[in-house]
Amino acid sequence: MTSKQIALILLCFLAINAESHDHQLQQQSAERGSENIISHSCIHDQIIEERKRPGRQVYSVTPQIYGQSGISKPLHRKGRALLGISESSLQQKDVKQPIRIFLNYDAVGHSPDRDCRKVGDIVKLGEPPVASRPGTPCNPHGDPPLYGDCWYNCTVDDISGKDKKHRLRKALGQTGDWFRRALAVEPVKGNLRLSGYSACGQDGGVQLPRGYVEEGVADADLVLLVTTRPTTGNTLAWAVACERDQWGRAVAGHVNVAPRHLTAEAETLLSATLIHEVMHVLGFDPHAFSHFRDDRKRRRSQVTEQLMDEKLGRMVTRVVLPRVVMHSRNHYGAFSENLTGLELEDGGGRGTSGSHWEKRLLMNEIMTGSVDTRSVVSKMTLALLEDSGWYQANYSMADHLDWGRNQGTDFVTSPCNLWKGAYHCNATQLSGCTYNREAEGYCPIVSYTGDLPQWARYFPQANKGGQSSLADYCTYFVAYSDGSCTDTNSARAPDRMLGEVRGSSSRCMASSLVRTGFVRGSMTQGNGCYQHRCVNNSLEVAVDGIWKVCPEAGGPVQFPGFNGELICPAYQELCSTGSVSVPGQCPSSCNFNGDCIDGRCHCFIGFHGHDCSKRFCPGNCNGQGKCLSNGICQCENGYTGIDCSTGNVIFLGEA
């Protein structure tokens, strides 16, 4: 009996008799942490709510100087590291430069009531009453990870030794370098000054060095204060902004990394986690949305919309920012006016709800509520940061997100039980191909101890659904641990009786093939891994070294020496390297300078033409600037924005 058949038998049994935890809309075992953490659960929103307690300040406002020249004296940098140093003091006004992130490690291991310094230490998480010690112990393996007020019992893994500190600096250094390449910002002129009004951050925060307040920090646009305090569950790190400038941009933040995750095994996951958490500091935070600026540098009137979605059967919150919508349309191939925004997460408890993309729609995107080693940064996430008005995004730093690509408007706006192909599976399809055809997979269906929400009931049994609350309990094929068609190292040996071959050119396809003279078993229709190639505008597949041309729209092909047939995918599914022709698409995708709706470009301010390829000075710079030959306004002193219509001394409290 093959491992696939064993897995199917077990799955059938589990589908009937699965035991699970209470249905409090938390993630199930497939997403849970263990001794080998496979994913990071973010608790960002939960931390923000904790900071809203009476008497606590969420952030301070410290105006910075922009658009003026001047050379600053460097600070003594013991225990610090500077990333992305540039001679920005003489840069042209309003020209954005790679963001300079300054990392301060002074607080690592130096908070006796917060840091684990020896085994058996009892330290605080949150603000537990002193009188309760140790009456409210933390559950280090709690799931979901709980950010609360408790006392943590330190183990050897929680102590930041020399090796862990080295890993910390390496990981954060790489994070800072990634953002330096991904984002540009109007550089602070002179030293970046911080208020020092209160401790920066959460969980006791970090007291700002006096020099940061009196002299400022040279060559920096953002200061991150680093700590290594313990966390619970599979939360590897967390981060919050604590100071903003007069435009609302974060200029200081607190990043905490749990020492027990500073290991060689967690290195790749930690890298993705730190990018995720620093994104929260930079602006992917519902509490930062109210400070977002438009191209005129005026406060945005709307960042999100919340409404009752009748098709989904529940309240949803969508980001309606122009570049987010534009890149969403191009990703999903959804050019209908019915796509009005990109949905934010509504599941997963207070830690993830509202501050992440909806996992149902973006799956392994890095800003969903759980991060793993497959997480990628999409153009939609970079677009959100650019739509803040604070940054210019380098979209070449975005990764290729497969999930949902070219699936159309209905994929974004309809319940997942109406999705097509490998994006949806049910109790009668226990085995199939994953959505990208890179692996054979199974359909995990969980029986919960309580009923699921009305909108998540995709089965006659009200307590049955998919394994992830973050993905709205949708059911889709998940790869077998040994089911990869492309990775020969981790996959099981191909079944020669079925004509399978595994390797970089192989993909999963439905098949009933079996060598003549052999019996396939009880499965008349299954799936397997077969080689493919794209030649002469055709998709070809191979079995036993014999190549056959597939029908353009997909369909069955037979091979000599085999009974049964192989079902080819459509040509565009495996062979389209560029954008797929989708109804309503616009010429040149409006050059990404405008939104495409039903085949017509709606250009962003400062652009015009049928494909938004031409620049112009909006309002002729309102008489407060010079219109350059390239169609860009060069504003006079005292004015800013794409059309020089906004005074450049505006504080957070102003409209």
Annotate each predicted stretch with a short phrase.
Residues 584-593, 617-624:
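Disulfide-braced loops of extracellular cysteine-rich modules
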Residues 597-598, 603-604, 614:
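Extended, charge-rich low-complexity regions and/or helical-solenoid scaffolds
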Residues 604-606, 636-638:
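Extracellular repeat turn/loop positions enriched in glycine and acidic/polar residues, especially those
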Residues 646-655:
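Extracellular EGF-like repeat architecture and associated secretion/anchoring segments
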Residues 2-19:
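Cleavable N-terminal signal peptides of Sec/SRP-targeted secreted and luminal proteins
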Residues 18-272, 281-584, 588, 595:
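Extracellular zinc-dependent metalloprotease catalytic-domain scaffold
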